[in-house]
């Protein structure tokens, strides 16, 4: 019997195994830091100080985490239906277009709290539309969802570059970006949260999209574990054969799951587009779609776990920037290596310790 199918207590499956993966990732990262002549303990101290040492650092950490929550949820919803959506990056790009079009159309006439829900819908619809073709090809033609979503990442990026360079660019400007949104198209910062703890947000773009991400996380939990559609998705993900015998329509479930996944990825655009830069720019996603894969796997595809994992990766991103600033020998490329190791052990090697844990747990039960 495969160890992957052996049930383990939640404290092992959702607690101990991810912690072991993280410890190994940080040990190897520490070795890399030591090899290049720096102190691993000093680097760890700078990582924590940069990400959590003051209100501005915490603000940046939660800003990054907000994007990762959306993309992590996007990946998780698809995984529950047995689909591996690698297209969150492209879906977030196209979702940014929907978000920006709403902001550009309404920012002159209504306040941000009117623009925001319409922008959420616009970003979600555009992201879902970009996921529809891969979903249709998987459901109706048998095309592999991994291949088609990867291809659509590149198509989406190219489409955004074309639109920003030739259509949406401000006349007379060289920068490929839209005009800056007026106040009605900008999400307010959450500096008041930092003030509750006696800290200042500073220049951090931590904004109200974080609250939206938490609300959406709860709604995803309700959908997946408390609705008929969620049950059908999980059944299809666990056993397509059982789903077929139960009369669960394969094509409909696949398409709906991918539409939801694409919509969640598209909503990620609210954070950088309306919450930070207040305009649509090239490459605003910044790899968040791919980080969402590791966030989802590390969080065991559960919204609560995804929130925790997203904050961890927010710490890595913000703390990594601080390390590269304070330790010149550790370049930005080295920080990417450290982040990559965490992604490797949290995502690709998430079951590395599981066989040993299964054997130890079974011996303990027999003993």
Where are these regions (language model features)?
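Short loop segments and helix-boundary regions at transmembrane helix junctions
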Residues: 5-16, 79-88, 111-120, 124-185, ...
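Transmembrane helix-bundle core of multi-pass membrane transporters
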Residues: 149, 153-224, 279, 334, ...
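Cytosolic-side transmembrane-helix boundaries in multi-pass membrane proteins
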Residues: 1-24, 30, 238, 245-252, ...
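Transmembrane alpha-helical segments in multi-pass inner-membrane proteins
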Residues: 259-340
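Single transmembrane alpha-helix segments in multi-pass membrane proteins
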Residues: 31-36, 46, 51-106, 120-143, ...
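Helix-loop-helix "hairpin" substructures at the membrane interface of multi-pass membrane proteins
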Residues: 194-279, 303-304, 308
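Membrane-interfacial amphipathic/re-entrant helices at transmembrane-helix boundaries
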Residues: 2-71, 113-114, 118, 203
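Short, non-helical or kinked segments that cap or interrupt transmembrane helices
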Residues: 38-42, 79-98, 139-148, 232, ...
